[in-house]
């Protein structure tokens, strides 16, 4: 029976697991999107979302609490200066998990985990697809185009051969 087994240990000791989650959280904050297994992504989501919530109020105490979990100055400043400003009006759900299939070597289920407000690539492709779509037929599209102006003809005389 699975009593009192609240979280996934990920096959690691407690110190290894906390170090791995801290490093993955720093990578997620720096790069905004990382590729990992689904189990690690779910554990990372539980780890990083309270830190993002804590970063919304920029106080000395909240910075110390976040730094004790991340241990990376660059990640902490990035979190408090850029990410917290972008997610200030969002009440939670700062990360998204997108499953990408199975890994070739061991068939592990892989996914992307990304910050929700930093998905510029997905937003650009969605608008690009809408812009290129048209319902006009080719015949009517060709008729509406202006006919090309006739090109000025220039004739060059070849030098006379003797």
Curated annotation (Swiss-Prot):
Region (Disordered), start-end ranges: 126-162
Protein family: Belongs to the bacterial ribosomal protein bL17 family.
GO CC aspect terms: cytosolic large ribosomal subunit
UniProt-listed InterPro entries: Ribosomal_bL17 (IPR000456), Ribosomal_bL17_CS (IPR047859), Ribosomal_bL17_sf (IPR036373)
Biological source species: Phocaeicola vulgatus (strain ATCC 8482 / DSM 1447 / JCM 5826 / CCUG 4940 / NBRC 14291 / NCTC 11154) (Bacteroides vulgatus)
Biased composition (Low complexity): 140-153
Entry protein name: Large ribosomal subunit protein bL17
SUPFAM superfamilies named in the record: Prokaryotic ribosomal protein L17 (SSF64263)
BP terms from Gene Ontology: translation
HAMAP family to which the protein is assigned, alphabetical: Ribosomal_bL17
Record-level Gene Ontology MF annotations: structural constituent of ribosome
Superkingdom, taxonomy of origin: Bacteria
Gene, per the UniProt record: rplQ
Keyword terms, alphabetized: Ribonucleoprotein, Ribosomal protein
Summary of subunit composition and partner proteins: Part of the 50S ribosomal subunit. Contacts protein L32.
Pfam families hit by this protein: Ribosomal_L17
Comp. bias intervals (Basic residues): 130-139
